[in-house]
Amino acid sequence: MSIQIFNTLKREKEPFKPLKDGEVKMYVCGPTVYNYIHIGNARPIIVFDTVRRYFTYRGYDVKFVSNFTDVDDKLIRAANELKLTVPEVADRFIGAYFDDVDQLNVAKATVNPRVTENMDEIIQLISTLIEKGYAYESAGDVYFRTKKFKDYGKLSGQELSELQHGARVEYNERKQDELDFTLWKAAKPGEIFWESPFGNGRPGWHIECSALAKKYLGDTIDIHAGGQDLVFPHHEDEIAQSEAATGKTFAKYWMHNAFLNIDGEKMSKSLGNFITLHDVLKDNDPNVIRFFMLSVHYRKPITLNDAILEDAKNGLERLMIAYQNIDHRIQTDDGEYVEETHEDEWLEQLTELKQAFEDDMDDDFNTANAITTFHELAKRANIYLSKETVSINVLREFLSMMRLFAEVLGLKLENTQTDSLDDSEVEALIEERLQARNERNFARADEIRDILKEKDIILEDTAQGTRFRRG
């Protein structure tokens, strides 16, 4: 089965066919760096990092570009409030961005272009649109003639006659038509600006991504992605600008993730539930946050609350414990493993699980189903570990496959927080030890006791059951 992508432009799943065999050119809209990103921003970051990882796993050479908007009204306001320059604000929060997403195990982009470092390309694209009659100057501003682009609305499915722009596009008397949107803003007194043929000023939001995608990926790209809130007007405007300028298709596939809600409500400052990723990471394992984000298909809304995060923590721990148990069994190999008579059957099961995982990811990157398959792998690993005799070959294959699944999903199976086990991990091992003893697999029961002893955890078998204390 080939990779299937739900293409927002076509409103259906389509088989992925790259523009060039073996290569994927992918652009994801990045943050406006005037503050810490909110937890909702982390969803597209994690989702499309995972999409990229899977393409890499399938053998594609992925060129991944994600920008920083480092000048706009919000940055100017933040600079005034913090008594800093706009570049100083941008530098501060770009650094904070990398600090946060590095914890989430997000791979580095091929390029993270900053708007302010690519102003020549932005100005050139605006000039091209003016030359072709798709844009016009008005009192130092430059606007795009929306109605001249006949395909406008094709991404969002809206008709020109019914369109109403969102908050980022304001009506003013300088426009020839209320649907026209800004490409270049004339400088106001005291604001940062760049020189251009249209006068001193700075770019509008939408033109930035068109120019950066063109510079780093070319006139046509394979995949353009972002949150569903960007479909209109941002991505709709990008299509209009880019295709008007080049006469070519801007992006072949458009991918959009659904919203993250806080306790069932959309996150917003007015509701008082606006949470930054930076704050969430202070109290939560980033590995758990990543697992949580991938536990629901990216096109479905996801809800964040303490109970759901606890479920994610427990789900991830089950995978980690299975992995660590297998690894420990291999590391403590004393040469007493025997050739287990059903080795071929177990290896065949592993092959089937690998195929199931690939089928899940091929189906529009269904990480929720992929995690279910991952848990089935861990379950079978635990069953195998409880056997009296095992094959080192099967153990190594279990370990290799768990690493493979984790790498695609960007999860870490080692204990990343501390070398010690928390109470739930200890209790899971105690339960596994009890099962081993009931099955008269005393070698495995003793092995679990040794694992816990290495972590300074002492077991005490009592009439009421097994208790533990930390040494």
From Swiss-Prot:
Motif ('KMSKS' region): 266-270
Catalytic activity, reaction form: tRNA(Cys) + L-cysteine + ATP = L-cysteinyl-tRNA(Cys) + AMP + diphosphate
Keywords associated with the record: Aminoacyl-tRNA synthetase, ATP-binding, Cytoplasm, Ligase, Metal-binding, Nucleotide-binding, Protein biosynthesis, Zinc
Pfam family, one: tRNA-synt_1e
Compartments, record wording: Cytoplasm
GO molecular function, one term: ATP binding
Gene Ontology terms: biological process: cysteinyl-tRNA aminoacylation
InterPro entries assigned: Cys-tRNA-ligase, Cys-tRNA-synt_Ia_DALR, Cys-tRNA/MSH_ligase, Rossmann-like_a/b/a_fold, tRNA-synt_1_cat_dom, tRNAsynth_Ia_anticodon-bd
Domain of life: Bacteria
Residue positions binding ATP: 269
Keyword field contains Mitochondrion: no
Its EC number(s): 6.1.1.16
Cofactor info, note text: Binds 1 zinc ion per subunit.
Cofactor or coenzyme needed: Zn(2+)
Any single GO CC term annotated in Swiss-Prot or TrEMBL for this entry: cytosol
Main location: cytoplasm
Motif 'HIGH' region per record, residues: 31-41
CDD domains: CysRS_core
Assembly and binders: Monomer.
Entry similarity comment: Belongs to the class-I aminoacyl-tRNA synthetase family.
HAMAP family the record matches: Cys_tRNA_synth (MF_00041)
Protein name: Cysteine--tRNA ligase
Organism: Listeria innocua serovar 6a (strain ATCC BAA-680 / CLIP 11262)
Gene: cysS
